[in-house]
Amino acid sequence: MGATSGIGLEVARLLAANGYEVGIAGRREERLVQMAQATPGIVAHRQIDVTKEDAPTELHKLIEELGGMDLYFHSSGIGWENVALDADKELKTVETNGMGFVRMVSAAYNWFAEQRADEAKLRAEEAEQRAERDEQRGEEAELRGEEAEQRGEEAEQRASGKERKARIACITSIARTRGLGAAPAYSATKRMQAHYLECLSQQARMRHLNIGITDIRPGFVATDLIAGSHFPLQLKAEDVARTIVRAIERGREVVTIDWRYRLLVAAWQLIPRWLWVRLTAIK
């Protein structure tokens, strides 16, 4: 989701190059068509606006066209420097990064949860059918009792979550670390996103769902989002994408990109609030 530019575009290209069958979505349909035509491995695309109520339905259509889904990657987001606190900009940021984020991530999570429940039910039915056949065979089943018991244990293990783990990976930001006065709605929504992902990770364990969550926190990336700005330590989208794909494939839960920003975030967290608000007020 959000594959028409920036990090989302680079991650889609890299996943396709790594052998994944990729479905892409975003608001700009012409960009989606161009990407699909130019990138082997991108097998489906769909125009989706995360701020629209029908966006989850469109996501389900894309999943159906793909024939299933193992990974949902969310990179849709907007943000501005907004020292003047323009209300329209603030509300648009909340609409996309807040409402749109929850709308799509919860839709992906619920789809995975339903699939896991259906798969577990099917495995249980298959195990029950095998047990019935073994019982009907009488003495033969008795001789092969140990084998049947072993199969039952294997089925139970699979039902308890040993199947391939689904994964939801989302781009938040280092902006979630502290409130940034220059971008109030942006940093606030990024904080919300990080907490929401943490909640889903906890809920997946509570419900014994085999769904992994990856929270990706990049620093300033040279994309359209910050075009024309003079932010320091800007990262290349291609480099960030490579780190993201590695993190996904390794099952990382949280990754801050890159090492310089990990040091910066650690320093930010040590600053007390009374000092932080004074530091950021200095021009």
Predicted segments, located by residue:
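Short alpha-helical oligomerization interface
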Residues: 82-95
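Active-site helix of classical SDR
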Residues: 105, 189
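Conserved NAD(P)H cofactor-binding loop of Rossmann-fold oxidoreductase domains
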Residues: 75-81
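Rossmann-fold cofactor-recognition segment
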Residues: 39-54
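Residue(s) in the substrate-gating loop at a strand-loop-helix junction
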Residues: 173
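Conserved glycine-rich cofactor-binding loop
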Residues: 4-5
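C-terminal helical subdomain
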Residues: 215, 227-265
